[in-house]
From Swiss-Prot:
PROSITE patterns to which the protein is assigned, alphabetical: RIBOSOMAL_L1 (PS01199)
Coiled-coil spans in chain: none
Name of one Pfam family that matches: Ribosomal_L1
Transmembrane segments: none
Subunit and partners: Part of the 50S ribosomal subunit.
A GO cellular-component term linked to this record: large ribosomal subunit
Name of protein: Large ribosomal subunit protein uL1
GO annotation, biological process: regulation of translation; translation
């Protein structure tokens, strides 16, 4: 079992691991335990009642936060001609077609956070599935990253729209801002993310959809949150 740092052990004492905090308390506590020398990311972890073995119960979609995540998002676009120009004007960091696919495949280029493609590019990037898929970077219509409206997609992802997907245990891990954010902005982001997740409940899920909610910072302990206080 890995040893935690002295700093981690000190801040962990501030959190009652047996208690479910209301959202207001949890945000205060998250900001208080974020004592690292960098601006820690605040993450919302949601444990669902999804049966990941059933394909119709998996969540893969996009959400947007009213105040963004505080992270500069690097966007790569696979497009040609007019669509490539639209992507560049919209602020894409990298735009190309076969050249980009080759750079990824042969040079291991992965210096981006989101990959968007026009539908006609899928035959070119299909061979990149084994590289981009495991990293959650493969363009996908469900995630809004395969589209002809590349300009709108680039702007949305630059503003903070992000893809979310359940992991193999049915959990969601969502960055909701930085510890330096004002409390009100963090709270609004958390509530917005949670409400959007509720709207993504697969029809096949029986009983309670959300089993547990935890808030944490990059280097801090988990803080259990009472789900009822996320919709008040």
């Amino acid at each position: 079992m890995p040893k935690h740092s002295k700093r981690y052990n000190e801040v962990r004492k501030l959190v009652d691991r047996t208690k479910e905090y209301d959202l207001n308390e949890a945000v205060d506590l998250a900001k208080k335990v974020a004592t690292a020398k960098f601006d820690e990311t605040v993450e919302l972890h949601i444990k669902t009642n999804i049966d990941y073995r059933k394909s119709d119960q998996q969540i893969r979609s996009t959400i947007s936060l009213p105040h963004g995540t505080g992270k500069e998002v690097r966007v790569l676009v696979f497009a040609k001609g007019e669509k490539a120009e639209e992507a560049k004007k919209a602020g894409a960091d990298y735009v190309g077609a076969e050249d980009l696919a080759e750079k990824i495949q042969k040079e291991g280029f992965l210096d981006f956070d989101v990959a968007i493609a026009t539908p006609d590019m899928m035959k070119i990037i299909g061979r990149l599935g084994k590289i981009l898929g495991p990293r959650g970077l493969m363009p996908n219509p469900k995630a809004g990253t395969v589209t002809n409206d590349v300009a709108a997609a680039v702007k949305d992802f630059k503003k903070g729209r992000m893809e979310i997907r359940t992991d193999k245990t049915g959990n969601l891990h969502i960055p909701v801002g930085k510890a330096s954010f004002e409390k009100e902005k963090l709270t609004e982001n958390i509530k917005s993310a949670y409400e959007q997740v509720l709207n993504l409940k697969p029809t096949g899920v029986k009983g309670t959809f959300i089993k547990k909610v935890v808030l944490s910072t990059t280097m801090g302990p988990g803080i259990k949150v009472n789900p009822a206080t996320l919709t008040q």
